[in-house]
Each structure stands twice: as structure tokens, then as C-alpha cells.
Regions:
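A short SAM/SAH-binding and catalytic strip from SAM-dependent methyltransferases
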Residues: 137-152
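A short acidic, Gly/Pro-enriched loop at the edge of an enzyme's catalytic core
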Residues: 127-139
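A short glycine-rich, Lys/Arg-flanked "PGG" loop and its adjoining helix->strand segment in the class I
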Residues: 154-169
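C-terminal lobe and adjacent flexible extensions of AdoMet/dcAdoMet transferase-like proteins
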Residues: 212, 218-224, 229-322
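Short, glycine-/aromatic-enriched active-site segment of Class I SAM-dependent methyltransferases
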Residues: 176-196
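Class I SAM-dependent methyltransferase SAM/SAH-binding core
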Residues: 59-128
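Short alpha-helix
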Residues: 197-213, 219
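Conserved alpha-helix/loop element of class I SAM-dependent methyltransferases that forms part
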Residues: 24-62, 76-80
Length: 322
């Protein structure tokens, strides 16, 4: 059995019998006025972060969600897109689609604003999405793409890029790991399906996104996720895994390379009211300005004693410039 078939088997079982500990996160779940999440739906939250960010979800967007789980984030997305088939959920596991549909029936009873027709569930493969080109405003996946090996990951990202409209957004949450993993971990199909041994370094993850054409990336969160230790896993060293939330924007690739926002800021504290680098960045006196890493590097090369560049927080929340 290949790793993709093992993954289907793991999530078939998780659909039939909810596994609260599977790929879960301790991140608080978004609470919105008038939104009630059914208990079973919450138990089937097989993610490692959140892909639901209100600032992405304006003007009744068309939303695609790949890997439906229990439907919790689909329900949250539909809160912002209250239209027939405003949200499309795609999954390759029949049992997960059936469980998700049952959860929506319960959600309809608990939420007066929600109608099942707001969400269209489709059987489909992340590697060949049943979605038209340039038809989606916001695409999302939560703790799925880390399972893919490199060739499949590249194909899945290409598919997301294909279906997004110009300036559309791909919002993702996945485990990452800066330490190398041995072959016993990498080749363990079940550990990969459980979102543990497929984790790659953050910079590699970001490069996969820019290689398929995304011109702007935002690192919105980075948190502790899991430990792989020698008592429980086939490893001689303790391996630390984090989860990351990233938004990739389908805008044109700048001539000087992608704009990647990791939470850096510049602060000018000189004698003048402002500092202008004559490249589109004006820093007011003692006011932080969010900047991309490319701009941070360029400003640092000026070697000014009245200019401070903060380290990456990996919690970028919008604004600023590149």
C-alpha cells in the first residue's frame, strides 16, 4: 500500500470514529456571533491551526476548501459567504464526505442563518481538483499538504494556483520541522498520514509556494506542535515540530523576487520627521512600519544608526509594504 492509500485508510477510520487527538491543535477555535459548532464537528477538527481569517473574507468570496474533515472550517467560511455553493469542499474519502454532510445537517439545526446549500461537497483529488480555472477567491487546506511527498506537493500547489482568481488567496496551515528526519520516519506511511513525518523546513515550504508563482507570502502564525522522541518513535534524537499558518497571494511575481512577510518591522528614530528610502517606503518618526524580508535586507544594507529592523515574529497581521 502506498502512502496515499494509507492516508485514505487513516481518514476513513477517522470519519467513522472521530479521533480527537488526530492532527489536532490547541489553538482556540474562532468564535463568531451567532455561530454554533456541533460537538461532533469540533471533535473532527483534524487541523493544526486555522485557515479562517476574516480580513480575507470580504465581498461574499467564492471559497474552496480541500480536505473537509468534519466540516468545521467549511461552516466558518460559509459564515462569511452566505450564498448557494459559496463554499466548495473537496475530499477523496467517501466516508469523510458523508460524515461532513451529516454534521452540516446538525449545524443547520443549531444555526438559523446556515443552510446546507451554502456548501457544495464534491469527491475529488487535491492533485486534480474538480474546479474551473480562475474561479476561486480564497482556497484553503489545513494539515493536508504536509502529507504529500515533494512531487505531489508541487502538483497540489499548482492546482490551487490554477483555480484561484488573480489576486486570490491560498491560506494554509501545516506542520514544519527544521531538523532532518531519518529514513525510518520519512518512510513510515502512517506517521506521514498522521501529519508528523512529512514536515519540511519553513524556507523549503515557502519556496514551494513561490516556485509555482505566488508573488506575495504572509507568515501569519508559527506555534509549537509536536515532539518526536526515541521512546515513542524510531529516532535517536528529539525532534521538534511546529505548525505554521501561511497566506499565499496570486499576484504578479516582482522582478526582484517574491515579497515574503515574516513579521519584520522598520522603525526610524532620527532627527527628521520621516525617512524616505526613495524606493516607495516612507517611515514616520518612531512609528513601526511592517516590511517584507526583502525590504528589511535592503534597509539593513544602508547601515543607518537611526534605523531599527526588528527580527521576524512569524505573526504578520497585514499592512505595511514591500
Amino acid at each position: 500500500m502506498g502512502y496515499l492509500e494509507t492516508t485514505k485508510s487513516v481518514y476513513k477510520d477517522a470519519a467513522l470514529t472521530p479521533d480527537i487527538g488526530l492532527c489536532c491543535t490547541t489553538t482556540p477555535i474562532w468564535q463568531f456571533p451567532g455561530l454554533s459548532i456541533p460537538t461532533k464537528m469540533q471533535e473532527m477538527n483534524y487541523g493544526c491551526g486555522s485557515t479562517v481569517h476574516p480580513r480575507d473574507l470580504v465581498n461574499n468570496p467564492k471559497i474552496l476548501y480541500v480536505g473537509v474533515g468534519g466540516g468545521m472550517e467549511l461552516l466558518q467560511f460559509s459564515y462569511f459567504s452566505r450564498q448557494k455553493e459559496g463554499v466548495i469542499g473537496v475530499d477523496i474519502v467517501d466516508e469523510m464526505l458523508e460524515a461532513c454532510q451529516a454534521n452540516f445537517e446538525e449545524a443547520e439545526q443549531q444555526n438559523g442563518w446556515f443552510q446546507k446549500e451554502f456548501v457544495r461537497l464534491e469527491k475529488g483529488d487535491a492533485l486534480q481538483l474538480p474546479v474551473a480555472d480562475s474561479s476561486i477567491d480564497v482556497a484553503a487546506q489545513n494539515c493536508l499538504f504536509n502529507i504529500f511527498k515533494q512531487d505531489e506537493l508541487k502538483q497540489a500547489l499548482k492546482e490551487m494556483y490554477r483555480v484561484l482568481k488573480p489576486n486570490g488567496r491560498l491560506v494554509m496551515s501545516d506542520p514544519i520541522c527544521e531538523q532532518p528526519m531519518n529514513a525510518a520516519l520519512r518512510d513510515d506511511e502512517r506517521l506521514r498520514a498522521l501529519c508528523l513525518s512529512g514536515s519540511i523546513p519553513l524556507n523549503d515550504y515557502l519556496k514551494m509556494l513561490t516556485d509555482v508563482g505566488f508573488g506575495t507570502l504572509e507568515i501569519r502564525a508559527k506555534r509549537p506542535y509536536r515532539i518526536l522522541d526515541s521512546k515513542h518513535y524510531p529516532t535517536d534524537e528529539t525532534i521538534y515540530i511546529e505548525s505554521v499558518e501561511v497566506c499565499a497571494i496570486k499576484d504578479p511575481m516582482p522582478e526582484d523576487g517574491p515579497c515574503i512577510f515574516t513579521g519584520k518591522a522598520a522603525i526610524y528614530f532620527g532627527e527628521e520627521p520621516f525617512f524616505d528610502d526613495e524606493k516607495g517606503h516612507i517611515l514616520l518618526q518612531n512609528q513601526p512600519l511592517s516590511i517584507c524580508d526583502k525590504t528589511a535586507a535592503a534597509l539593513a544594507l544602508l547601515n543607518r544608526t537611526d534605523l531599527f529592523i526588528s527580527p521576524s515574529t512569524h505573526h504578520y497581521d497585514g499592512g505595511g509594504c514591500c
